[in-house]
């Protein structure tokens, strides 16, 4: 097989459920495309060497043509050395009844360390995708500890929320999923995220025209998406894994193998954004890729009073989380 290029990729939390699903999609070509080789490093904590060796065996047994090299490691320095991309999946998990403040404290040290090692080991233009919750704040911590890396290359995953919203709109309108476009999530990946149905299109028409029941949009769909993660935990006793892995692959593919004009929601550094969100936050915006390979935050979208108020609530939460971790 003739490859266009080979990229070096690190995945943390390699023995966890999300990583287990994601690794096979990555090696198959679902992230970087079918002509891109993968130099893969799978990381997890010391003490998990045996489990890592089992994952290596399975990846080897798949005989993926794109998987040019593979190593498993319990050293962050080894995992991040010279990488082009990192998927920071490993984090202290959220369990039933756990508050976000508990997660902030437990994960602050994890992402501070990972950011510091990225700063000394990764390529200067490496792209970093953070999945572990609270994802916006964890991403901000890692970004803040890696000043040598481009702040624009840090992303917190909102694609799972985008996918959830797309599915709910499609089901309600009784149309195929690909008929629902311009799905926008603002703010934090939390129960205060803002699924902005006023921007979405269904079969090319405004979603609020196709689904005229504003009460359903505001009071059923929106809170259902906001609380979907908790609902999954209550139902299965564990956080979303397969759907999160799928969303991560799609989120990264939108950046590495973009579709012309595609809108996607991602948490990025708020510096110089066109919506007046304070700088030095990781905030969810609708974005699209440019021919240069960089992204832009889609400008010029208007907020009605309902959406504007929801965005302020989400902004307040992100700002408070940042203030809390700054004290740790």
UniProtKB/Swiss-Prot annotation:
Q: Which residues act catalytically here?
A: 189 (proton acceptor)
Residues bound to substrate are 94, 100, 133, 164
Q: What class of enzyme is it?
A: oxidoreductase
Enumerate the residues binding NAD(+): 13-19, 107, 114, 131-133
User: Might you give the EC number(s) for this enzyme?
Assistant: 1.1.1.37
Gene3D superfamilies in alphabetical order: Lactate dehydrogenase/glycoside hydrolase, family 4, C-terminal (3.90.110.10), NAD(P)-binding Rossmann-like Domain (3.40.50.720)
Q: Which GO terms describe its molecular function?
A: L-malate dehydrogenase (NAD+) activity
- Name this protein carries in UniProt: Malate dehydrogenase
Q: Which gene encodes it?
A: mdh
């Amino acid at each position: 097989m003739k490859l266009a290029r080979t990229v070096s990729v690190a995945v943390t939390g390699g023995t966890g459920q999300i990583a287990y699903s994601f690794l096979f999609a990555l090696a198959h070509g679902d992230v970087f495309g079918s002509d891109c080789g993968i130099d893969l490093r799978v990381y997890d904590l010391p003490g998990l060497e045996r489990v890592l060796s089992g994952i290596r065996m399975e990846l080897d047994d798949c005989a993926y043509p794109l998987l040019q090299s593979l190593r498993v490691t319990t050293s962050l320095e080894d995992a991040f050395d010279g990488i082009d991309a990192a998927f920071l999946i490993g984090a202290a998990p959220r369990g039933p009844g756990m508050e976000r403040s508990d997660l902030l404290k437990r994960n602050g040290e994890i992402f501070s360390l990972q950011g510091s090692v990225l700063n000394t080991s990764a390529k200067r233009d490496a792209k970093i995708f953070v999945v572990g919750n609270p994802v916006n704040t964890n991403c901000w911590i890692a970004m803040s500890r890696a000043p040598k890396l481009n702040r624009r290359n840090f992303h917190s995953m909102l694609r799972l929320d985008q996918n959830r919203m797309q599915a709910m709109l499609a089901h309600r309108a009784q149309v195929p999923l690909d008929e629902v476009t311009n799905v926008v999530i603002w703010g934090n990946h939390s129960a205060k995220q803002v699924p902005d149905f006023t921007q979405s299109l269904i079969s090319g028409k405004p979603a609020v025209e196709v689904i005229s029941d504003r009460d359903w949009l505001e009071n059923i769909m929106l809170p259902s998406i906001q609380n979907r993660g908790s609902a999954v935990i209550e139902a299965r006793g564990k956080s979303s894994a397969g759907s999160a892995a799928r969303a991560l692959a799609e989120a990264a593919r939108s950046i590495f193998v973009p579709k012309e004009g595609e809108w996607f929601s991602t948490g990025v550094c708020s510096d110089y954004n066109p919506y007046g969100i304070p700088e030095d936050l990781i905030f969810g915006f609708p974005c699209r890729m440019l021919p240069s390979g960089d992204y832009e935050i889609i400008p010029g979208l208007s907020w009605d009073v309902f959406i504007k108020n929801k965005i302020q609530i989400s902004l307040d939460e992100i700002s408070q989380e940042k203030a809390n971790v700054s004290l740790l």
